[in-house]
Amino acid sequence: MKRALISVSDKNGIVPFAEKLVELGVEIISTGGTKAAFEQAGVPVTGIEEVTEFPEMLDGRVKTLHPAIHGGLLARRDTAEHMEAIAAHDIKPIDLVVVNLYPFQETIQKSGVTLEEAIENIDIGGPSMLRSAAKNYAAVTVVVDTVDYDTVLTELEEHGATTFETRQRLAAKVFRHTAAYDALIAEYLTNITGETFPEKVTLTYNRKQVLRYGENPHQDAAFYTEPGTVENSISSAKQLHGKELSYNNIRDADAALKIASEFTEPVAVAVKHMNPCGVGVGENIEEAYLKAYEADETSIFGGIVALNKEVDAKTAEHMSKIFLEIIIAPSFSEEAFAILTKKKNIRLLTVPFAGSVKGFEKTSVNGGLLIQASDSVIEDTASYEVVTEKQPTEAEMKALIAQWKIVKHVKSNAIVVGSDKQTLGIGAGQMNRIGSALIALEQAGEKAKGAVLASDAFFPMDDTVEAAAKAGITAIIQPGGSIKDKESIAMANKYGISMVLTHVRHFKH
């Protein structure tokens, strides 16, 4: 290796890296701020303009876009015609390229960033050099990540060159990196234009964790996250204690967070297998947790609990009495943290809460991807329609709205029985609505008397209303829209139940 081109925005570790290259007899070519950093550190360096014999122009937009650079990168060393061509133009081969790109992601995440600032942080020369070097990885080593500096130096010291396998791996890394960089720019500009579903979608995610296994032990898995911070998201969670999250932990935590984010009042949500098993609302977080626990004392064991307020010592004392996989909250008091961390394996996570989840959901199918707006429609309760002779009381209406927030997060067909303070019975994922209703009512038992019932979709028959009435339900909330709505309304009137239609369906598959 004789010649290296180095141009980086992230200068961490670059000076000692270059110093070692010089010790190994490598000539350093550099640009702008990187060149200045080398000169200040006393590292021998050749300016890019000395190689191209052309000055930087357009405020630095054009520096390395020159045949003297790309010819030196792309020339195949095993092809005589290539080597003769660059020699004829006095172009020297470049054997190592170290480049990281303008911080576009960091720029667009700044508060108040302008379009002009974003545009100026779109790197052109950097990706071009990286791609040229990566294409010719048979002869050229290309580095885009500071973590690879040591590998390159070790191989140079031991062999005088990098191995083919290392060059190939680094080239693949470069193409992933530039593809992700371009995808981020495309997404940013697409959002500005207001296009919702463009003809092509390129998604970029960063690997956060290689998981022990997936949903089952025979399935390999990893966790990838979107660039930047996403509020109300497990991807932005900070783990304070406990062992690593599993695949199932992450999915359950995501489900719990979505429900907890629906409420502004203190709420505790217990989840098992992506369905809530108990949700409690209270004047304070202790009361909320106790209501969630009482909702289903059996299923909460080994579950995940999400709370939308700081966990205090009293709440922590209650939670420490049972086995919980994960507790998620905006924060933990010092006393609560001390109590909970006595359990070695419990995972404690903090997540920033900021209202219900918005944006888009992505679901893979075999050979494709479904994208839809999140089910975060803002519903105006004033538009809800009471269709029965009996009007819901103020207390019943409060309970109906609370359970309506919950039922949208239960796998369809979904029925939730509850009060204004807690769920009492949850029927999830049955192939017919009456099946889910019977499960929820059976779970609620005697507590169903005086409770309310929420259904994520309309009643195809009046059987659910009749079953609810016989169990003691006093009010029902559902979207309506069935051709047999009149029969369900008539059944409600027969038993003196109030029924509210929201005209919004909340299927969850």
Swiss-Prot record:
Query: What InterPro entries would the database entry show?
Result: AICAR_Tfase_dup_dom_sf, Cytidine_deaminase-like, MGS-like_dom, MGS-like_dom_sf, PurH-like
Pathway annotation from the record: Purine metabolism; IMP biosynthesis via de novo pathway; 5-formamido-1-(5-phospho-D-ribosyl)imidazole-4-carboxamide from 5-amino-1-(5-phospho-D-ribosyl)imidazole-4-carboxamide (10-formyl THF route): step 1/1; Purine metabolism; IMP biosynthesis via de novo pathway; IMP from 5-formamido-1-(5-phospho-D-ribosyl)imidazole-4-carboxamide: step 1/1
Q: Catalytic activity annotated for this protein? A: (6R)-10-formyltetrahydrofolate + 5-amino-1-(5-phospho-beta-D-ribosyl)imidazole-4-carboxamide = 5-formamido-1-(5-phospho-D-ribosyl)imidazole-4-carboxamide + (6S)-5,6,7,8-tetrahydrofolate; IMP + H2O = 5-formamido-1-(5-phospho-D-ribosyl)imidazole-4-carboxamide
Q: Which GO terms describe its cellular component?
A: cytosol
Q: List, in alphabetical order, the Gene Ontology terms for molecular function in this entry.
A: IMP cyclohydrolase activity; phosphoribosylaminoimidazolecarboxamide formyltransferase activity
Q: Which CDD domains match?
A: IMPCH
One Pfam family linked to the record: MGS
Domain note: The IMP cyclohydrolase activity resides in the N-terminal region.
- Spell out the protein name for this chain: Bifunctional purine biosynthesis protein PurH
Q: Which organism is it from?
A: Listeria monocytogenes serotype 4a (strain HCC23)
